[in-house]
UniProtKB/Swiss-Prot annotation:
Organism per entry: Xenopus laevis
Localization per Swiss-Prot or TrEMBL: Cytoplasm, Cytoskeleton; Cell projection; Nucleus
Function: Component of the Arp2/3 complex, a multiprotein complex that mediates actin polymerization upon stimulation by nucleation-promoting factor (NPF). The Arp2/3 complex mediates the formation of branched actin networks in the cytoplasm, providing the force for cell motility. In addition to its role in the cytoplasmic cytoskeleton, the Arp2/3 complex also promotes actin polymerization in the nucleus, thereby regulating gene transcription and repair of damaged DNA.
Predominant place of localization: cytoplasm
Protein name: Actin-related protein 2/3 complex subunit 3-A
Gene: arpc3-a
């Protein structure tokens, strides 16, 4: 079974580094264009997460795949936090904190995918990339809470938390031991 790739790459999609800056439906402020379609890159990443997380190798077919990879790895980080939460409210607080926490971007030490991502070419691109990734992180965390928490019990679903130990591409956005 092949891995799933992003279908959202358009010829006029803006790039930051070699990563696509795709439109998203977001309530958070940031540089991402507003999405008008039903499905955006975050929906796609959440939908394909359970299938893609099993792959140790992933062929990058376009720049949108790099965005998909980042979100997939971020979802893994979110699940580590959400499995310890007792309610959706607590999970949303954890996701907000994780979303705004200082994080490395391509080209910085500590970014696990420097071999696949090009660092920003100047200070302005650096700021746009950091703001875009933060916007992705915040919106992904919020949407993931809606998927992970069971509305009846207000507890994390085992059908999501069972993926905590899985590492997509043998990579993690967090430092070793965290």
């Amino acid at each position: 079974m092949p891995a799933y790739h992003s279908m959202l790459m358009e010829p006029d999609t803006k790039l930051i580094g070699n990563m696509a800056m795709l439109p998203i439906r977001s309530q958070f402020k940031g540089p991402a264009p507003r999405e008008t379609k039903d499905t955006d890159i975050i929906d796609e990443a959440i939908y394909y997460f359970k299938a893609n997380v099993f792959f140790k190798n992933y062929e990058i077919k376009n720049e949108a795949d790099r965005t998909l990879i980042y979100i997939t790895l971020y979802i893994s980080e979110c699940l580590k936090k959400l499995q310890k939460c007792n309610s959706k409210g607590q999970g949303e607080k954890e996701m907000y904190t994780l979303g705004i926490t200082n994080f490395p971007i391509p080209g910085e030490p500590g970014f696990p995918l420097n071999a696949m991502y090009v660092k920003p070419s100047n200070k302005q691109e650096d700021e746009v990339m950091r703001a875009y990734l933060q916007q992705l992180r915040q919106e992904t965390g919020l949407r993931l809470c809606d998927k992970v928490f069971d509305p009846q019990t207000d507890k994390p679903s085992k059908w999501w938390t069972c993926f905590v130990k899985r590492q997509f591409m043998n990579k993690s956005l967090s430092a070793p031991g965290q």
